[in-house]
């Protein structure tokens, strides 16, 4: 490699390193700001298991400026796309995944579910119980997402947490 090529490579790497540092600092600033805004609007939302500032902000954006327009937890679940859709035919009675709703909110609830599945023993036993009932893992995860939406609804309205301790018997 020629010395001018080496110098150009070093210069380019230094520029890229500075850019990475600047972007990392910008990301940290934005994360602090998101945390501040979420804490100012719905601090109890951050108390939910598996919820971070990014996920909470996504759910707040989905609920909008007037979360009271969501008349029930079912309307919130439908808005997030975690409400199952009837897909029965003849003697077969079943429900399928809803492809409607806010996909970002659906993805946020999915991330909450994955976080809980990894770290929360109650959620793991809930999923195993649903699978033992004859549901596929995918269907059990869909049930879990619906329960999470049910649990998040009062938090979005600013009501006290109904408690994740209800998970095994309520869901």
Task: Map each language-model feature to its residues.
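A detector of single, family-specific signature residues
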Residues: 1-171
């Amino acid at each position: 490699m020629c010395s001018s090529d080496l110098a150009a490579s070093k210069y380019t790497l230094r520029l890229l390193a500075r850019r990475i540092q600047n972007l990392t600092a910008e990301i940290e600033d934005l994360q602090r700001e998101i945390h501040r805004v979420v804490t100012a609007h719905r601090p109890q939302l951050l108390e939910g298991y598996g919820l971070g500032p990014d996920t909470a902000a996504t759910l707040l954006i989905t609920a909008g400026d007037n979360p009271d327009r969501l008349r029930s937890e079912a309307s919130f679940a439908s808005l997030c796309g975690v409400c199952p859709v009837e897909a029965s035919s003849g003697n077969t009675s079943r429900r399928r995944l809803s492809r409607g709703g806010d996909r970002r909110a659906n993805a946020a609830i999915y991330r909450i579910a994955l976080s809980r599945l990894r770290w929360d023993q109650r959620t793991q036993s809930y999923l195993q119980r649903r699978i033992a009932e004859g549901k596929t893992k995918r269907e059990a995860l869909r049930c879990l997402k619906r329960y999470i939406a049910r649990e998040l609804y009062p938090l979005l309205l600013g009501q006290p947490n109904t408690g994740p301790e209800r998970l095994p018997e309520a869901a």
